[in-house]
Amino acid sequence: MAGHSKWANTRHRKAAQDAKRGKIFTKIIRELVTAAKLGGGDPDANPRLRAAVDKALSNNMTRDTLNRAIARGVGGDDDANMETIIYEGYGPGGTAIMIECLSDNRNRTVAEVRHAFSKCGGNLGTDGSVAYLFSKKGVITFEKGDEDTIMEAALEAGAEDVVTYDDGAIDVYTAWEEMGKVRDALEAAGLKADSAEVSMIPSTKADMDAETAPKLMRLIDMLEDCDDVQEVYHNGEISDEIAATL
């Protein structure tokens, strides 16, 4: 779980767990279908679809698979009747948590999310209870690279911020709608990112200790096990030392 970014440990841990469970492609395909249904099949004209395509490619989905998913959405596939639902709540240690879901049955989804919170010492909150603590951003990640070169190209392309971490990794932050454009500009400059995704970035953090960290991880595990849950975002900060024990 040792991530290069102060928020990355959860991102990377989630990707590894979803891949192990064989769920990540199912969730990405669902998002591709829904995004294409709602905004059309052209990623250049549909920021939500472009973000889903970038996520699919970052997770090594083939072009053939993602193109079929887009075609299903444009063609009105049943999966495209899903709606996006955002739940908010509080986890162990006072962590703020946002859960992004795609569902065709709100009652089923909220019951599963509420059950996870009740089992793990958290509370499902009301709309707006924690959303103000997060900002929706595009995050383009380079596991390594020349900081000055990436920063110059990123800022010229319209990025909002560039952050370098102790291990040399670099995160480029963008307005979420501009992530695809910035990534394309970076690639045109010969800078190929390791991943690109839309994320909810917390403005403050809640430090987890040896007691609260495992409880938070259990809650995240339970939420991610819900088929309707697409993403789980939180502001918990876990040190490398504690993370190594989890």
Curated annotation (Swiss-Prot):
The keyword Cytoplasm applies. Transmembrane segments: none annotated. Signal peptide: none annotated. Residues 1-20 are annotated as: Disordered. Pfam families: TACO1_YebC_N, Transcrip_reg. Keywords: Cytoplasm, DNA-binding, Transcription, Transcription regulation. Its main location: cytoplasm. GO terms for biological process: regulation of DNA-templated transcription. It comes from the Bacteria. It is found in: Cytoplasm. GO terms for molecular function: DNA binding. The keyword Transcription applies. One of its GO terms (cellular component) is cytosol. Belongs to the TACO1 family. This is Probable transcriptional regulatory protein YebC. The lineage of its organism: Bacteria, Pseudomonadati, Pseudomonadota, Gammaproteobacteria, Enterobacterales. The gene is yebC.
